[in-house]
Amino acid sequence: QKRMVKGLADRAEKVRSGKVQPTEDNMLRITNDGRKLALDQRLMNPLLPDDPGSKANACVDKVYEIWEKTKEQRSTQMIFCDLSTPKEDGFDVYNDVRDKLVAKGIPKEEVQFIHDADTETKKAELFGKVRNGTVRVLMGSTQKMGAGTNVQTRLIALHHLDCPWRPADIAQRNGRMVRQGNLNKEVSIFIYVTESTFDSYSWQLVENKQKFISQIMTSKSPARS
């Protein structure tokens, strides 16, 4: 993985020094590859092994631990991931996470993807199941699981498997759980970061954007406020 991170740095240097055309390679492409690598190295090369220390595996362990602990009250959890959404063939993080949760003992029907609810009727049905605790783990992207996703009733934990582009997206994600109508007095938000990758840069970038927005809104220096 370190070798691949170095490869991204080399590519960035070539882009900065104008050694490659923007059509060949550019910072957006490099950043996207960096985000994929931070999520799971198999998104860069499906032949690479599953890293036991990956953040997806850390998330699986934490989700299962909370699922087990809150069995009696049937508390629910949300996993947000904008990259590597479910697909029919080839590797994707959604199916990988679900398969591992099922292997640990969670019934498959209790782990659902928002992407499978492709009509308003199916969506309403799915949201109802999350609210009553029939579905206990819901996975989705910011776009599909943001505004209008009212499933807060039993939500006890929310997991950020990747970092969205905008501060508003983080607020949108967290707002699914931290709102009126949640029966839990205490809730947890987990952010998963892969060391020595684009992850810390991405979260730092979003935090700085938020400070800048706050500065404009309040006309204050973010360092002083």
Regions found by a protein language model. Name each.
Residues 1-51, 55, 64-65:
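Inter-lobe connector of SF1/SF2 helicase motors
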Residues 48-60, 89-94:
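Phosphate/oxyanion-binding active-site loops and adjacent basic polyanion-contact surfaces
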Residues 83-115:
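Conserved helicase motor "Helicase C" RecA-like lobe of SF1/SF2 P-loop NTPases
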